[in-house]
Curated annotation (Swiss-Prot):
BP terms from Gene Ontology: carbohydrate metabolic process
Induction, per UniProt: By ulvan and rhamnose.
Name of this chain's protein: Putative beta-glucuronidase
Reaction equations catalysed: a beta-D-glucuronoside + H2O = D-glucuronate + an alcohol
Residue stretches spanning the membrane: 26-43
């Protein structure tokens, strides 16, 4: 399978007519036009429409039945219309009734092909199907694929006919111990055709498997070496022409290369003064390759190229293009509220842009390869990638498991080989945990297979590093290793972080810290976050597999936003001030679904994200932005903490997160002074004030000033009371009309005096009894029928059903048996 073909463009015929007027002026004009065309295309003559690529996401039918036989499936009457991408787990994986479906389903589409060309191959390209699939064309099995998260091609040439063609696909995400990832992984394995599908036509004599390397790169000169396979059915006398174009489309270098053993080696040795690809300036070139027969272009492909080199110094820092770069990273799971893993390209792109806007330069794609749009965005935005084989937990499997796993690694590397953003091929995460097979945690056997994978990765791609996370016994096998450091969450205090990284910098030659952080429930705050001091051992940082006998913040903490803000602030202060540290990778950028966490504040959600599942930033997002982003901003902690209480004249801490050199804070129009930002000071790099609120409404304004004397400001209104609430005696409901026409229904816990109970955290349950429906199963702070209160408050979005009757809402829990609200 030629992964380069997914980015190939169509080339158009450019020829000069033979019946030209022989006037001298006309010949000059023709010559000029010809030279312009040649300089633009690099080719003497191009064949019109040599390749086509058509997106066929629209107008599919879906059958949610686990039927094995295709004929029984086709005769079923329950097919429903859908568009791709699609997952049947979009709305069943979270909330009150998860019903996480792991089973088989069917998809079908009528595909019209008007005229079949005998000199063309026809193929379907699937960007990703979870997790096993069988593809049928006009009733015949054309192929299939084992394993999700990877693109694959099905040649349908011999199965199609002119006119209408029936494409039928069986997809199955059932538990299969022989296919990674393990069911014990802490994320949902979404079933379905979760990415784009394409109909492609290519010439029977064609190019494939374009692999590009840059063996030598410096600021002054670069070398490009590429190989491309040729399918030469007719044993014709073919050649390959290659053009390297810069970002403006100008040809930098061009040459014609011979073909030997159906392979062409493209070698450009002296590319002068290349514009380097890095995280600040992700300069990209384009390599265009044409297959020539007697001077005519019969096929052509193209791929982007980035010139860069990198190095992990032994027991030291990371260098990109000879300059030290601190890896400022996060993790990304491929899912979004309401659609699960069936995200649009726009949603993928928005995720990556938000990560970049935060100031990150590195992303670990966990725990599986992701949509092609993600890699494309990282190439363009300047985000370095850790790409991961989904060997996540489950230990070592049988021989079939091993074959499937090696095949998947091969596919990942071949498919994503040409992306300059990728620097690491990860071979797994927590692989030894909870084996699915007998003796699956045998260290010697694990290491033997890990060595096979490591050798395979280096054989397929000698230019990049291999890595694993949290399998200590195999740390010596791979190039880069991440131990488990969860200071302040699964073990110890966050103040142990410096000791942890100092320990591992000495122990592992190439140490990159992947995964740290903790959960936060949007809107939950406390004046005195639980830090564990005096209750837990402060020096720990390792995450235990079984935590029933472990005291840690994950279990005894309050899940407040302000605790997590402090945790990240401490970690970033350490990493930003350590000159010999490679960097760290926060877990995870966005809240994501998991079958292992039904008891969480939002059921079945891992809430360690810097943004919620819909992409809305939490407080912690702005902590990272203050350390990493260059775009000036200020953010007062916290915009989700607007109701506070405490005794009169008791000073409260206010932190401002900003990347400006200095910030001035105003309370109710009065300046509280200017403070200088100092990255060595905790918290908030010294942008912290003690102040006294008045009773009632208070207005805070933070004004940041840049080095150029430009100002940016943030404003926050806080309602403060001197009376502490008592115990909750009931729940009340309120509604607000939103701009989209829906209602936000909010439940508030109150005491006997009617005060909102800011310390009430119990779970509540929403239900729409008539007149509408809740936007449930979103896994967001306003999209879950079951949710824990945050400072005595919880909400859900409700949509009218169009029947012109009042909306009747109910909220209840074990203590408060039912409160009702009617919205006319």
């Amino acid at each position: 399978m030629g992964f380069c073909m997914k980015d190939s463009k169509q080339y158009y015929k450019s020829s000069i007519g033979k019946s030209l007027k022989r006037s001298n002026g006309y010949l000059k004009l023709v010559l000029v036009l010809y030279l312009i065309m040649v300089s633009w295309s690099g080719y003497s003559k191009e064949v019109f429409n040599s390749r086509t690529k058509e997106n066929i996401n629209a107008n599919w039918l879906y059958l949610e039945k686990n039927i094995k036989d295709i004929n029984l499936a086709l005769n079923d009457a329950n097919w429903e219309s859908i568009n791709l991408p699609h997952t049947w787990n979009a709305l069943d994986a979270t909330d009150l009734n998860p019903g996480y479906r792991r089973s088989g389903s069917w998809y079908k589409k009528e595909l019209a092909i008007s005229n079949i060309e005998n000199n063309k191959l026809y193929q379907l390209y699937f960007e990703g199907v979870n997790i096993n699939s069988e593809v049928y064309v006009n009733g015949q099995k054309a192929g299939g694929h084992i394993g999700g998260y990877i693109g694959f091609t099905i040649d349908i040439t011999e199965f199609i006919k002119s006119g209408k063609n029936d494409i039928v696909i069986r997809v199955d995400n059932s538990y299969d111990p022989e296919v990674i990832p393990s069911q014990k992984s802490d994320f949902f394995i979404f079933g379905g055709i979760t990415r784009d599908v394409w109909l492609e036509t290519i010439p029977k004599q064609h190019l494939s498997e374009l692999k590009i390397t840059t063996p030598k790169v410096s600021e002054n000169e670069a070398e490009l070496l590429a190989t491309v396979a040729i399918n030469n059915l007719n044993n014709s006398n073919l050649k390959v022409q290659a053009n390297l174009l810069d970002a403006q489309g100008v040809t930098v270098v061009s040459s014609v290369f011979k073909i030997k053993n159906n392979t062409a080696k493209i070698h450009f040795r002296n590319i002068k003064n290349p514009k380097l690809w890095d995280t600040e300036h992700p300069n990209l070139y384009t390599l265009k390759v044409a297959l020539l027969e007697k001077g005519d272009v019969i096929d052509s492909v193209q791929n982007r190229v980035g010139f860069r080199w990198f190095e992990f110094k032994d027991h030291g820092a990371f260098y990109l293009n000879g300059k030290r770069v601190l890896l400022r990273g996060t993790h990304r799971h491929e899912e979004h509220a309401g659609v699960g893993a069936a995200m649009s390209n726009m949603q993928h792109r928005k995720d990556m842009e938000l990560i970049k806007d935060m100031g990150a330069n590195f992303v670990r794609l966990a725990h599986y390869p992701q949509d092609p749009e993600v890699y494309k965005a990282c190439d363009e935005l300047g985000l370095l990638i850790w790409d991961e084989l989904p060997w996540c937990r489950g230990g070592l499997g049988n021989e079939t498991w091993k074959t499937n796993t090696k095949n998947m690694l091969t596919e990942i590397i071949n498919q994503n080989y040409n992306h300059p953003s990728i620097i690491i091929w990860s071979l797994g995460n927590e692989m030894y945990w909870l084996p699915d097979f007998e003796n699956g945690d045998d260290t010697d056997k694990m290491n033997s297979f890990l060595t096979e994978l490591n050798d395979l990765a280096h054989q397929l791609d000698p230019s990049r590093k291999t890595a694993i996370r949290k399998y200590y016994e195999g740390s010596h096998i791979v190039d880069v290793f991440s131990p488990s450091i969860w200071s302040g969450w699964y073990s110890g205090s966050y103040k142990s972080y410096q000791k942890a990284i100092d320990t591992y910098k000495k122990e592992y030659p190439h140490f990159l810290h992947a995964e740290y952080g903790g959960s936060s429930h949007v809107g939950r705050h406390t004046e005195n976050p639980v830090t564990g001091e005096g209750k837990i051992q402060s020096d720990g940082w390792e995450e235990e597999i079984v935590q029933t006998d472990v005291a840690n913040i994950a279990q005894i903490g309050d899940w407040s936003e302000n605790y997590i803000v402090d945790l990240f602030d401490w970690h970033l202060r350490i990493s930003e001030n350590d000159e010999n540290f490679v960097g760290n990778v926060q877990w995870a950028f966005k809240d994501f679904g998991t079958p292992l966490r039904p008891e969480n504040a939002i059921p079945y959600m891992n809430q360690k994200g810097l943004v919620d599942r819909a992409g809305n930033p939490k407080d912690a997002f702005y902590v990272f932005k203050s350390y990493w982003s260059k775009e000036p901003f200020t953010y007062i902690e916290s915009h989700t903490w607007t109701e506070r209480q405490g005794p009169k004249d008791l000073a409260r801490d206010i932190s401002v997160y900003s990347n400006c050199p200095e910030v001035e804070l105003f309370l109710n129009g009065k300046s509280l002074g200017v403070k200088k930002r100092d990255l060595k000071v905790f918290p908030a790099a010294g942008l912290n004030w003690n102040l006294n609120f008045k009773e009632g409404k208070n207005t805070l304004v933070a004004v940041g000033k840049t080095k150029e004397n430009k100002t940016v400001k943030d404003e926050l209104a806080i309602n403060y009371r001197f009376t502490k609430n008592g115990k909750a005696v009931g729940l009340k409901l309120e509604s607000e009309l939103l701009e989209n026409g829906n209602y936000l229904v909010t439940a508030i816990a109150y005491d006997k005096n009617g005060l909102r109970c800011l310390d009430y955290e119990d779970q509540v349950y929403f239900q729409c009894l008539s007149g509408g429906e809740t936007l449930k199963s979103q896994g967001t702070p306003t999209g879950s029928e079951s949710i824990a209160m945050a400072n005595g408050k919880a909400a859900i979005e409700v949509k009218r059903d169009g029947k012109n009757i009042p909306v009747v809402m109910m909220v209840l829990n074990q203590n408060f048996k039912g409160t009702y609200l009617t919205i006319e």
